């Protein structure tokens, strides 16, 4: 093949040979120039999207922190309510409570606790469960132990702490929205002798805690991953589970927010990570920028083709 090209070149007239040599020497700097220009354009596209994803993650960090504080503060308020603790302790120890005491507790304390929850739009519910069924239920605040056992998290060996993505089963499935997913902080309530007298479930919806997991934004996807490796989010992730695990393994825990560019599975992604230590997990957001990067490649190819055509015409 090389010999045939050599003979074909030697058979050409001198002016054609001269033109071909000029075209060849001009193609090299044009190719280098195109490579540099469009490489810089590609890096600019990547940098812009990395800045966007970092900004989005910073907003998510502030929003999640606000919601965690809201749940923690509400839980502490319930834990410091002496009247509530007194009723839980009475139920735990079998101490009789008169009807008048129950009515006073309901009108003065339960109503104020209910208003506290109702006036906080971030919260879904705050429920207090006794350690047995020897308590007069006062909805939507105080419940018996048997009611708590209907919740999914109550079946765990250790359910204290954060529980994610469960349905509210405290009442009949006919009366509760089974499509509503809940996240809650479950906290033990102990008396002065550190004996258990109850449990507090402070809950909000998953969509409220992690709105990015449920937003329908083109070419963007998010999930929350616990330290146990459990994924919560849209199940239609735009890439394989293996790639997602590789992305998580690449996370730099030294930084609060880490944003990286990833090329995998013939596609281009910008991945932003954030460790949420209070929840014992990590928030991950992915943007598919394949189309934007390929536009740069297409422009580069068109530029090179046009320049070559111009050289041939001029020659």
Regions found by a protein language model. Name each.
Residues 99-113, 139-175, 219, 234-261:
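Extracytoplasmic/periplasmic sensor domains and loops in membrane signaling proteins
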Residues 208-283:
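Intrinsic low-complexity, intrinsically disordered coil/linker regions enriched in small/polar
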Residues 175-200, 216-218, 263-282, 290-291:
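Extracytoplasmic
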Residues 1-43, 47, 51, 308, ...:
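Extreme N-terminal signal-anchor transmembrane helix of membrane signaling/transducer proteins, especially
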Residues 51-159:
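Extracytoplasmic/periplasmic sensory segments of membrane signal-transduction proteins
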Residues 118-204, 212:
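Extracytoplasmic/periplasmic ligand-binding sensor regions of membrane-associated signaling proteins
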Residues 106-118, 193-233:
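Solvent-exposed, extracytoplasmic
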Residues 282-315:
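Cytoplasm-proximal transmembrane signaling helix
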């Amino acid at each position: 093949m090389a010999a045939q090209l050599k003979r074909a070149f030697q058979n050409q007239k001198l002016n054609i040979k001269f033109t071909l040599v000029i075209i060849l020497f001009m193609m090299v700097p044009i190719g280098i120039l195109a490579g540099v220009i469009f490489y810089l354009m590609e890096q600019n596209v990547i940098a812009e999207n990395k800045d966007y994803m970092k900004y989005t993650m910073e907003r998510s960090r502030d929003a999640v922190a606000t919601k965690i504080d809201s749940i923690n503060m509400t839980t502490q308020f319930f834990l410091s309510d002496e009247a509530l603790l007194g009723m839980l302790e009475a139920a735990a120890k079998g101490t009789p409570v008169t009807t008048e005491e129950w009515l006073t507790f309901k009108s003065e304390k339960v109503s104020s606790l209910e208003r506290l929850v109702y006036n906080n739009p971030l919260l879904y519910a705050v429920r207090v469960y006794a350690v047995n069924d020897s308590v007069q239920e006062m909805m939507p605040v105080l419940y018996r132990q048997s009611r708590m056992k209907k919740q999914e998290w109550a079946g765990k060996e250790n359910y204290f702490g954060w529980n994610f993505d469960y349905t509210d089963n405290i009442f009949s499935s006919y009366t509760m929205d089974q499509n509503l997913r809940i996240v809650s902080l479950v906290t033990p309530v102990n008396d002065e002798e550190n004996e258990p007298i109850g449990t507090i479930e402070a809950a909000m919806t998953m969509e409220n805690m992690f709105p990015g997991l449920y937003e329908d934004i083109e070419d963007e996807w998010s999930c929350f991953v616990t330290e146990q490796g459990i994924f919560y989010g849209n199940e239609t992730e735009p890439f394989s589970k293996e790639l997602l695990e590789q992305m998580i393994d690449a996370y730099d825990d030294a930084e609060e927010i880490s944003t990286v560019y990833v090329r995998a599975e013939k596609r281009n992604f910008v991945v932003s990570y954030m460790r949420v230590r209070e929840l014992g997990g990590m928030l991950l957001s992915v943007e598919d920028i394949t189309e934007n990067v390929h536009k740069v490649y297409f422009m580069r190819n068109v530029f090179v083709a046009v320049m070559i055509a111009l050289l041939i015409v001029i020659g």
